[in-house]
Amino acid sequence: MSAKDIKFGSEARNLMLDGVNMLANAVKVTLGPKGRNVVLDKSFGGPTITKDGVSVAQEITLEGKFENMGAQMVKEVASKTNDIAGDGTTTATVLAQALVIEGVKSVAAGMNPMDLKRGIDKATETAVNALREFSQPCNDTKAIAQVGTISANSDISVGDIIADAMEKVGQAGVITVEEGSGFENELDVVEGMQFDRGYLSPYFVNNQESMTANLETPFVLLHDGKISNIRDLLPTLEAVQKSGKALLIIAEDIDGEALATLVVNNMRGIVKVAAVKAPGFGDRRKAILEDIAVLTGGMVISEEVGLSLEKVTEEHLGTAKRIEIGKENTVIVDGAGKKVDIDGRIAQIKAQIETTTSDYDKEKLLERLAKLSGGVAVIKVGAATEVEMKEKKGRVDDALHATRAAVEEGVVPGGGVALVRVIKALDGLTGDNHDQNIGIDIAKRAMEAPLRQIVTNGGGEASVILNEVAKGKDNYGYNAATEKYGDMLKMGILDPTKVVRAALQHAASISGLMITTEAMITDTPQDTPATAAAPDMGGMGGMM
């Protein structure tokens, strides 16, 4: 076992603080509308240029083991905030640095670290409650676009395209971000439920131009087993023929005589029919079939529930306004399922998402949720170069997460103003002793740090502008982009409440751990001996 290097007390905390400052100073230059770029060197390809705080933080590993521990702990603040809120990483880093600097100073001055931590925790809890009261709902398209614009570093086109996507697929719908092939951002929207299974035979195609089978107001038969015998389907086909409607069959597989008979019936115009395989495998296939059943108002024909194909009646079939079947995809538009049943199914899937621990399962559940919620939107990011593409895609991802957070918990004035307003809620707050009161004061001063940094990055005088903003009320603040004061919400400068809350909570949590650190242990660096030179191979001088 290798020897350990141990540091105690103020020496340990100061080394850790050096690491915190190195990481935070690199990250905080990106904050605000006039934030600066950071260039990241990559082991292959060209360098990456970014204004995303978490991307900068993730690149940093320091040479000194003790300093690196401090840097990694602040990196954790950025990562956790990003995981929960999808944005606010730079704000969280700035808050953590301010809390740690003041906390370490106070411990060096003889304060009790545990009481300082209790004071910071007490102030944070009160501030979070005040933020929630200060929050305003974010439901209209304009507000969503403004949040997206701010998060994408004041790129209006990004805010607009995200608001457009949310309007088309709903706030619960799935929006994905992909690399596009052009110079401009594009939005692709797939209405209804789409799954990745196409027609089982090209003879079902009725639109030769698009090579698709289009069914208007069809019945939908769902079966969780294989269909090989046409006799099983005869009662259903007869009922559908009498109604004069089309039929889509979704089953685990349809082959042999059954598929051949369906093709012949369709080509002769006896019954307009198409067949596709059910998407997914195993239990996931059953779950998706149930989703389609709920969406179309039908039932899954299964031996498990005591239903066989021969006993199927019109009541067991689902319906939809339109179904389009391509070679590889099927889209069900406007299923006839009852809204209360669909909402119940959505709530059930949301509950499963909350409890699952597997990232893969969560991803698949989110896909199902999107399909039931009414569509999928794909934002295709356009750029001139690969370097610009990576940077732009990162910003669009951030903006998308921020808008989701805004819809979830509402918005507060941006530009660091919300945290300055929250300080007033802490004015009457006192701890159990003097040291806890110092902890509360540390938290108050730290809450000024984001606004100070935004102003500093914009080239302004932080103290003067902070005093002016502090004199104001409610949404009154400073727009660093235009260098003007006014109502932040009217100027379109908003922050999602969830982002500000998560940044403050995580910064307070990690800084509390750092302030109460009394010892640090790391491996002693090993001096690796130089490799010995190869021995002289005497007697082999004649070799060339």
UniProtKB/Swiss-Prot annotation:
Q: Which family does it belong to?
A: Belongs to the chaperonin (HSP60) family.
Per the UniProt record, the source organism is Ruthia magnifica subsp. Calyptogena magnifica
HAMAP family for the chain: CH60 (MF_00600)
Give its E.C. classification number.
5.6.1.7
Gene Ontology terms, cellular component aspect?
Answer: cytoplasm
Q: Which residues bind ATP?
A: 30-33, 51, 87-91, 415, 479-481, 495
| GO BP: any one term | protein refolding
Mind telling me what this protein is named? Chaperonin GroEL
Q: Where in the cell is it found?
A: Cytoplasm
